[in-house]
Swiss-Prot record:
Keywords: Ribonucleoprotein, Ribosomal protein, RNA-binding, rRNA-binding, tRNA-binding. One of its GO terms (molecular function) is tRNA binding. This is Small ribosomal subunit protein uS7. PROSITE patterns: RIBOSOMAL_S7. One of the primary rRNA binding proteins, it binds directly to 16S rRNA where it nucleates assembly of the head domain of the 30S subunit. Is located at the subunit interface close to the decoding center, probably blocks exit of the E-site tRNA. It comes from Psychrobacter arcticus (strain DSM 17307 / VKM B-2377 / 273-4). Belongs to the universal ribosomal protein uS7 family.
Length: 157
């Protein structure tokens, strides 16, 4: 984090199939070891599976709705005051909300037990759309932590 000037955010090129920057960013989250074509195959396969299962014409809008479900509104940050560390609830900035939601979806999908990663991701997207699944559980856990520590909100930065 530089002290002098604000670093410009990098523009991400939209994905080739849907032309969506959101999907392109999610592909980058799913990608491991630089294997982008494999990550694209996984994400496109998952969106295809979900759109067939739910009879959806526009999988991108469905994906954005799922992301909206998983996005956290508040989180806790550790703040040291007078020798004690408090978990202070803070509002999450929009770019971090999206990044956290994508990270949680990818991690939750990787932990599932379906056969292929595309099927795991499809299952997790389906569950998140219904308000279930590990990604939603993670979001609720973060919200619960923030709610439990509401008493320390006056220690905001």
């Amino acid at each position: 984090m530089p002290r002098r000037r604000v670093v410009a955010t990098r523009e991400i090129l939209p994905d080739p199939k849907f032309g969506s920057q959101t999907v392109a960013k999610f592909i980058n989250h799913v990608m491991s070891h630089g294997k982008k074509s494999t990550a694209e195959r996984i994400v496109y396969g998952a969106l295809e599976t979900v759109s067939q299962k739910r009879n959806i014409e526009d999988p991108v809008s469905f994906f954005e709705d799922v992301l909206e479900n998983v996005r956290p509104m508040v989180e806790v940050k550790a703040r040291r005051v007078g020798g004690a560390t408090y978990q202070v609830p803070m509002e999450v900035r929009p770019s971090r909300r999206t990044a956290l939601a994508m990270r949680w979806l990818a991690e939750a999908a990787a932990k599932r037990s379906e056969k292929s990663m595309a099927l795991r991701l499809a299952g997790e997207l389906n569950d998140a759309a219904d308000g279930k699944g590990n990604a939603m559980k993670k979001r609720d856990e973060v919200h619960r932590m923030a709610d439990a520590n509401k008493a320390f909100s006056h220690y905001r930065f």
